[in-house]
């Protein structure tokens, strides 16, 4: 009898320190094939811990992606779930020091944002190494499953707990693409604080194609 941790022992060994996003993409298919083979050989699909994460993935992924204008099919959700459990249940996992350039971080940023929200919903109490590893490989994986077509970044800033987020989500869903991001501003926010937040955002994105800011001017300080 093999435990749920032993079945995935050393499965993350195909990822080595120093990999960038391109190198990670090259080994993802092998990683998925190895996961599937081990699951089938040991008939472990139905054990409670695996089923628990499968349900969390199926209940969360498309609800979150909908607000960005996308959805995954059942096979893609299955792939996502398999990668999550493989990393969580690899008893030999120690992390990998990937080397992601600033250029790649900007290029893949929107995929990273989506994966971060999904992992917030799916993961429980796991250490930073596990979270960071999954964040990186799943960001690369998602970039092959959904395509962000818009090259222009657009940011909505409004006062209210969810006002900007709701507007951005609805617009992205109608467009069918991740165009708008949102800053929901507290009622008492100062203009200086807002400027700092926008500047931090601009540093993290690619602005060669332009940036659109939609601001609720009526609620800003004069």
Model-derived regions: residue spans:
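A cross-family "folded-core" feature that marks the main globular domain of proteins
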Residues: 1-222
């Amino acid at each position: 009898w093999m435990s749920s941790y032993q079945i995935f022992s050393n499965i993350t060994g195909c990822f080595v320190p120093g990999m960038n996003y391109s190198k990670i993409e090259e080994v993802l298919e092998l990683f998925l094939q190895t996961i599937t083979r081990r699951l089938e050989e040991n008939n472990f699909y139905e054990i409670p811990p695996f089923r628990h994460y499968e349900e969390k993935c199926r209940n969360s992924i498309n609800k979150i992606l909908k607000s960005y204008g996308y959805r995954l099919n059942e096979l893609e959700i299955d792939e996502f779930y398999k990668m999550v459990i493989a990393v969580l249940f690899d008893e030999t996992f120690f992390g990998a020091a990937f080397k992601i350039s600033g250029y790649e971080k900007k290029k893949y940023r929107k995929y990273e944002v989506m994966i971060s929200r999904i992992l917030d919903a799916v993961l429980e109490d796991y250490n930073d190494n596990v979270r960071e590893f999954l964040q990186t490989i799943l960001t690369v994986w998602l970039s092959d499953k959904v395509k962000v077509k818009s090259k222009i970044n657009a940011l909505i800033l409004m006062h209210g707990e969810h006002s900007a987020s709701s507007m951005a989500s609805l617009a992205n869903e109608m467009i069918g693409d991740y165009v708008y991001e949102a800053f929901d501003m507290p009622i008492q926010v100062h203009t200086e604080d807002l400027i700092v937040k926008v500047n931090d955002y601009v540093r993290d994105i690619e602005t060669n194609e332009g940036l659109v800011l939609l601001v609720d001017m009526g609620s800003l300080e004069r």
